[in-house]
Structures are given as structure tokens and as C-alpha cells.
Amino acid sequence: MKIDESLNVHSSLLQLIGNTPLLELHKITKGLKGRYFAKLEAFNVGHSAKDRVAKYIVEDAERKGLLKPGSTIVETSSGNTGYSLAMISALRGYRCIIAISDKSSHDKVEMLQALGAEVHLCPANVAPDDPRSYYEVAKRIHNETPNSIYVNQYFNPLNPESHYQTGREIWEQTQGEITHVVVCSGTGGTISGIAHYLKEQNPRVQVLGVDAYGSAIKKYHETREFDPAEVYPYKIEGIGKNLIPTATDFDVIDEFIKVTDKDAALMARKLARTEGLFMGYTSGAAIQAVKQYAEAGKFDENSIVVVLFADHGSRYMNKIYSDDWMKKQGFID
């Protein structure tokens, strides 16, 4: 049967990545000056913004002949990139090996395994150059595995390049009226790619990154020096870093806002119960950053603010959506 694309029928899973919806927020931002819109990346087929990166990098490797049937994809991930790569590997017939932080939710680990990925759980609270860190474990596996590629999203220029299109979508969806974009930063690929596109269209667009307490990213942006004193354990997954990723272009980011583990978790739960949006931990962090910025008087009546919600809440059932976990962290009574 010939597929008639005019009927909105797709022939590949990968066609369901990108062109995610933009939704205006009402209840969670009530009382704040300006208008607020969520870029819902959970509408990608793999339910996160990382689908875009995985597709872009895999297709690039295929074009260059680096990936062939039977090849292996190796990556370091807090969960979402790993899931997206495992999904595409299942589709394409590649072996997929993911080194994942033990801070990642058990849900993410099980989802990776469900797609056939081999998972290596690594301690989160070790230095990046420690042989047990997920960076070093992934590198070692890649070096020991013939016919493999190491995606290396923290230092791969294709990561931000993949999100140039995300910036284009945001610009077109707001008809060029956007004044601020708020994005959580881990590898920095999402925020950097979006920022490049938006600033090319209008240099006055303010790009606001969201960082975690326990991460060195905000301080580095301000001083251009890595301060190890900034680094200590924290709970939020997929945000902040204990190293400085070259995938982050600090020159196109105007400001970073830090949020606490507790505030981000509570805000994600509030988002579900007010807007009906069941989003991930970093989505709570992003909307918490918006509130802090608004309370500091930095938005006005003319502000058109886009907040990127990176993934779906189903990946955090055993964490922020578990009352037991929240109580153990001291986040709720």
C-alpha cells in the first residue's frame, strides 16, 4: 500500500519527532505580568526533547558511514537521551549501551531496558574523571567495542545544532513576538541551539537558563571560571553539571537562574494539579525559575515568555510523584 501523507499517516517513527505544540499557561502563572507559553517536548514520540538530538546525531553518523547494521551506539545519559537512542536503535537494528547515573529514576532505567538497551549504572557523586563516572565508563565501553560510536552529547556540536530547529518552531509559533525563552540547561545543547536561532531573528530576545544548586554552570557563566566549591550532590535530573560542557554556548545565554530541588519538585506537582500537565522534574524547575524571575520584577505586561518543558512525568513516578520519596527528601510532611 502506498502511504498517502496527506492523510497524516507516517511511514517512520522518526517522522514523529519535532514540531511540538506550544500551549498558553493560565493557572500556574496567574498574577504574573506578561503571557506565558509552554513548549511541550513530551509530544515527541519518545516523550522528550532528547529525541531531536538522538535523531540528528544518528542520521549524521549514518550519512558518514559511521553506523551500519550491527553497529553499537554508546552514550552517557541521565536517562532521556539514552531512551531516545535506545528507541532509534531498536528501529534501526543497532546495539545500544547506556552509562546512566544512579541519580536517575528507576523508571528511566526500566524503560531503557524495555527497549533492549544495555544499562550500566554509575555513581552520580564522583568526579567526572573518576573511572567509575558515567563519562569514563561510556568512553571505556566505546574504546573496547568495535564498530561503535560514542554520542558524547556534552561535547558534541551536533547537540546544539539539532535544536536550531526547535528555535525556529518557537519563533514561528509566537509569530516573532517572543521576548524571553526559559530553558533548563544540562548539556546546554537545547538552550544553545534555540538561542542561536532566536538571537539571529531578534538579538533582543532574552535567553534564560535554569540551573540547580550543586551545579557549576551559573557561576561559570558569570566568571568563566570553574569553581569546584559550587559542586555538591543534588536531586534534579537532567539539569546542571559538575563539569563545563562545550555543547553549551555561554555567549548566547543572557542569564542563569538557580532553583532548589524542593521548589522544582513541588512546582512540577502543582503544574499537574493546576494545568493538568503531567511533566518531568525539569519542567517544574523551569516554571519555578519563571516565578522567581517574575517576582524579581523582570517581566512586564508586554513579555511573551516561552518555557521549555523537556519531558513527561511518567519518568518520575518513583520520585517527585511519589509521596514516599517526597517525604524522605523532606519536601512534604
Curated annotation (Swiss-Prot):
The encoding gene: capA
Cofactor names: pyridoxal 5'-phosphate
Residues that hold pyridoxal 5'-phosphate according to the record: 80, 186-190, 282
EC number: 2.5.1.76
Organism, scientific name: Capnocytophaga ochracea (strain ATCC 27872 / DSM 7271 / CCUG 9716 / JCM 12966 / NCTC 12371 / SS31 / VPI 2845) (Bacteroides ochraceus)
Biological role: Transferase involved in the biosynthesis of capnine, a sulfonolipid present in the outer membrane of gliding Bacteroidetes and essential for gliding motility. Catalyzes the formation of cysteate from O-phospho-L-serine and sulfite.
Domain of life: Bacteria
N6-(pyridoxal phosphate)lysine: residues bearing it: 50
Protein name: Cysteate synthase
